Amino acid sequence: MTTGPHDFWAKVLTFWLPVSKERRRTIRHRLRSNFVRMTIHKDVQIGEDVRFHEKSHLTPGSSIGDHTGIINLDVQGVGTIKIGRYSMISWDVLAVTSNHDFNGENIPFDHENIVKDIEIGDFCWIGARTMLLPGTKIGEGAIVQGGSVVHGTIPPLAICGGNPAKVFAYRDAEKFNRLKAEGKFFDTFDVN
């Protein structure tokens, strides 16, 4: 087993925990796994009670709202992603925030990046293996079916899927607003 700074910090962070030695070992393993795989720049804004389960990469200037759960999100490009409150991001979600300029002075594309940030509203659910293309905006309460390729704007409460993602249904707005007013939010997940 290789050791590194993540092993040291995993031991330091778990040494004083009032749990059994076996439980401490399990926690250390999870910490080591997450230390190795996380790339979150110092100027990313992370709200309260945000949970990451596995590897994620977030670009500088990105933000995550309170009580959001992320299993595995990879933000690529030089743009940012803004994720609202109480949203859930499933595994292997790719968000591409910039693209090469194919109308530039070189072919097949120029060195210039065209940056288009991505926005995900509050109370959204992004399914596994979804790809969010530059400039995507997902409205409050929308659901994106797993495996979708999303470009453009998805309206609030829409349920969409496919390649390219198309809206095929809407959530019940009355029920959604009632649950929201009552504060009935999905508790930030524990994926074990």
Where are these regions (language model features)?
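Terminal amphipathic alpha-helical/low-complexity segments used for targeting or macromolecular assembly
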Residues: 1-36, 86, 93, 99-105, ...
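Short linear elements at protein peripheries
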Residues: 2, 17, 21-67
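Flexible, glycine/small-residue-enriched loop-and-beta-strand segment within the central core
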Residues: 51-137, 171-172
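Short beta-to-alpha loop/turn elements within the nucleotide-binding domains of ABC transporters
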Residues: 62, 136, 147-148, 154, ...
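A generic "structured core" feature
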Residues: 84, 133, 143-149
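Conserved catalytic segment of ABC-fold P-loop ATPases
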Residues: 139-142, 155-157
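Conserved active-site beta-strand element of glycosyltransferases/polysaccharide synthases
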Residues: 160
